[in-house]
Amino acid sequence: MSRPVVAIVGRPNVGKSTLFNALAGERISIVKDTPGVTRDRIYADVSWLDYNFTMIDTGGIEPESGDVILSQMREQAQIAIDTADVIIFITDVKQGLVDSDSKVADMLRRSHKPVVLVVNKVDSFEKYMTDVYEFYNLGIGDPHPISAASMLGLGDMLDEVVKHFPDSSKQDDEDDRPRVAIVGKPNVGKSSLINKLAREDRVIVSDIAGTTRDAIDTAIKYDGKEYIFIDTAGLRRKNKIKEDIERYSIIRAVSAVERADVVIVVIDATEGVTEQDAKIAGIAHERGKGIIIAVNKWDAIEKDNNTVKQHTEKIRQILSFIPYAEILFISAKSGQRLNKIFELIDVVIENNSMRVATGVLNEIVTEAVAMQQPPTDKGKRLKIYYVTQVSVKPPTFVIFVNDKNLMHFSYTRYLENRIRDTFGFRGTALKFITRERKENE
């Protein structure tokens, strides 16, 4: 089930970052020791009641020219409209209602996306409620007073946000077609890839309008099986500032990855793996999605007998945090190896849904422990009682031990490698959870 996406929009200095940090807390999706994973706080995982969602901070995009504040607000609003299920529109009670608020409210209203209007910096409800009522003039619903800095009113605001989430459980029950996100930095050939796939022999294509983010998903039937391709291309922005475009492409990638079963990360063979490529791949890795790395423009590379090997090693070195990812060298222009994409998608989906019987799993772990003893600390040795798989997408395993503080990440990686040696889990992240139990339990 994909997570709903919530975007925060607001003028500079109204408290977007304060609200973002207040909601994210320590759950912000930054893996400190994982190379290539974005650290610039664009998105975070948030939980409220029984709901989990992804929050996107649309701030930090600077306009090239024109009215700075209004232009920036329009940029943010467009990103939110493009990517979000629900939009939090944050205003400032102390600055009051200003013209740019009204203009952006018009944009949001025309989008027909759910908008939760928030009035920030209401440190005293008794003192400021009369000023809060002024924001009814925006005509986009009830204003919700909060103080992000003091954590006041956030519960009521979140109650309103989750009311607007789509019923994704119904969607998942009704639609079991594999969903494939094509992601990558601008100009690597994402749209060309989808267009070429759509023209392949044995393919039937149809567009699906009116999805939750007003994108056009493409249904492609290949050899009698239908796949939904999610395209993050088509940046509807005139701004050419490099940092802005990169930030925007990451935001679009987050949205697409949330909805996908398999993520195809497209990189440019003529450029190699860039920092931006690594950030986007990191999003898919964090979300536990199946990953295929499509090295596009392979026809533009001069080759000898070692070219594929050398490029593969270089990619593995830079993207060392996803050693399980499948790599495919393609040309969207010529169609080279595109027929392999559907085959790989099927393999990755099958592996991402694989279950391993507890008995078989523990035979592997017992053998692995015999080959390499668990670590010790101050004379105390880690004991592994048993391992069981608890879920799929991604395959998730719980390791029961005597003291989880003794379970070093390197030993978890060792066990993961032994499990992969037996079952492969091609293109699939594996998640491990360590829990303590007493020996006689």
UniProtKB/Swiss-Prot annotation:
Record keywords, A-Z: GTP-binding, Nucleotide-binding, Repeat, Ribosome biogenesis
Q: Where does GTP 1 bind?
A: 10-17, 57-61, 120-123
Per UniProt, residues of the EngA-type G domain are 4-169, 178-353
Source superkingdom: Bacteria
Q: Which GO terms describe its biological process?
A: ribosome biogenesis
Residues annotated as domain KH-like: 354-438
Molecular function, one GO term: GTP binding
InterPro entries per record: AAA+_ATPase (IPR003593), G_ENGA (IPR031166), GTP-bd (IPR006073), GTPase_Der (IPR016484), KH_dom-like (IPR032859), KH_dom-like_a/b (IPR015946), P-loop_NTPase (IPR027417), Small_GTP-bd (IPR005225)
Q: Where does GTP 2 bind?
A: 184-191, 231-235, 296-299
tRNA processing keyword on record: no
How is the quaternary structure described?
Answer: Associates with the 50S ribosomal subunit.
Its family remark reads: Belongs to the TRAFAC class TrmE-Era-EngA-EngB-Septin-like GTPase superfamily. EngA (Der) GTPase family.
Task of the protein: GTPase that plays an essential role in the late steps of ribosome biogenesis.
In Swiss-Prot or TrEMBL terms, this protein is called: GTPase Der
Its encoding gene is what? Answer: der
